[in-house]
């Protein structure tokens, strides 16, 4: 960790007021980071000091001892740190990961008494990126982390999966319509079809809120189905009432949590959830009238998030469609209308102008969503 130039008085205050995370036995060469910063672990590394209280994301990638250039997949975990707090963790050589089991209180207190001697082995938190980190996580609370993080608390770039069936016997393979072992595969598609059904290992899956696949209520008429397929407010309200009954604003914490897991944790599933949740928020016109404060905050969140990703990242490789421009086009057509709250409308107009100038995205064309919508009717419902 490179030392940062910091005012001596500020450094002294942070030493006594900031939090400290000690990580023992982390192998030399490991890629280690906290929030927006990462380094290669040296022989003296024991952790990070002067960390501002709040939510932080620590991440790391182990390296192959035989070939140090081979870096493993990123893993990470969230910590809620308090003023003058001390967290003691250690590296598990067996599992090649940070053991998140709490250290004995006696060990923590002994470490606290020895902090000044340990100081030379602790890297200072880089305050240059603190504002950026806060802008990406200001709606993530300790409760958000507890609700969404996996039961084992480890955020893994690659899912730890197991086959739904053990596949030890031929009858198991037949149950999933898989050919006998050794049978020649004739195409790539056939190869994909042969892969067994997998499921995440228990306790390792990020516990995102379940988003509805049916956007309309049971027993809806064809006209209602069309309405709820164009304006997703019914589906959004279902999520808010079920998952965030006391505070609808907490959905923004989940949006930020998913983005951080993708951006810093390299979790692709988190990016997919972020897209689905954003799509639900942006296509809910009636909800904008009811939850205008939520949407004002959503614009601020998107302003900071979109500053971290290249403009062409959202373009589908196959279709060349840009998920974000099409989604935001619908959002702006609603948020910039005369019917919404004036503060929300002004902020949406400024944000639209900012994106048009920065990314050269065109929001002027009529959204495809304004075209006639073809919806699948549930069984038993016929057009009159």
UniProtKB/Swiss-Prot annotation:
Keyword terms: Acetylation, mRNA processing, mRNA splicing, Spliceosome
One Pfam family of this chain: AAR2
Modified sites of kind N-acetylalanine: 2
Gene3D superfamilies membership: 2.60.34.20, Aar2, C-terminal domain-like
Gene Ontology CC annotation, any one: spliceosomal complex
GO biological process terms, semicolon-separated: spliceosomal tri-snRNP complex assembly
Matching InterPro entries: AAR2, AAR2_C, AAR2_C_sf, Aar2_N, AAR2_N_sf
Role description: Component of the U5 snRNP complex that is required for spliceosome assembly and for pre-mRNA splicing.
Subunit structure: Interacts with PRPF8 (via RNase H homology domain). Component of a U5 snRNP complex that contains PRPF8.
Similarity section: Belongs to the AAR2 family.
Protein name per UniProt: Protein AAR2 homolog
């Amino acid at each position: 960790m490179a030392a940062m130039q910091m005012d001596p008085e500020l450094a002294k205050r942070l030493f006594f007021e900031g939090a400290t995370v000690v990580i023992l036995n982390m192998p030399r060469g490991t890629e280690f980071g906290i929030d927006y910063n990462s380094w290669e672990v040296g022989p003296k590394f024991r952790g990070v000091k002067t960390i501002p209280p709040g939510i932080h994301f620590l991440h790391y990638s182990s390296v192959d001892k035989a070939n140090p250039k081979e870096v493993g997949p990123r893993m990470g975990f969230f910590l809620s740190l308090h003023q003058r707090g001390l967290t003691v963790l250690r590296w598990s050589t067996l599992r090649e990961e940070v053991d998140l089991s709490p250290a004995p209180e006696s060990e923590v207190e002994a470490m606290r008494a020895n902090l000044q001697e340990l100081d030379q082995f602790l890297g200072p938190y880089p305050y240059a990126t603190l504002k950026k980190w806060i802008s990406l996580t200001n709606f993530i609370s300790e409760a958000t982390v507890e609700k969404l993080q996996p039961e084992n608390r480890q955020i893994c770039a690659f899912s730890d999966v197991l086959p739904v069936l053990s596949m030890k016997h031929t009858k198991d393979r037949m149950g999933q319509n898989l050919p006998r072992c050794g049978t020649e595969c004739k195409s790539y598609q056939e190869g994909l079809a042969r892969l067994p059904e997998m499921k995440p290992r228990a306790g390792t899956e990020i516990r995102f809120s379940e988003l509805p696949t049916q956007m309309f209520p049971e027993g809806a008429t064809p006209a209602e189905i069309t309405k709820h397929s164009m304006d997703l407010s019914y589906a959004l309200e279902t999520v808010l009432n079920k998952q965030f009954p006391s505070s609808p604003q907490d959905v923004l914490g989940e949006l930020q949590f998913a983005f951080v897991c993708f951006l810093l944790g390299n979790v692709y599933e988190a990016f997919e959830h972020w897209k689905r949740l954003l799509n639900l928020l942006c296509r809910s016109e009636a909800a904008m009238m009811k939850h205008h404060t939520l949407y004002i905050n959503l614009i601020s969140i998107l302003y900071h998030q979109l500053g971290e990703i290249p403009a062409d990242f959202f373009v589908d490789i196959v279709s060349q469609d840009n998920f974000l421009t099409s989604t935001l086009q619908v959002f702006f057509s609603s948020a910039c209308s005369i019917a919404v709250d004036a503060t929300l409308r002004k902020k949406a107009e400024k944000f639209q102008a900012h994106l048009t100038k920065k990314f050269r995205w065109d929001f002027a064309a009529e959204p495809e969503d304004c075209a006639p919508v073809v919806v699948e009717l549930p069984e038993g419902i016929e057009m009159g």
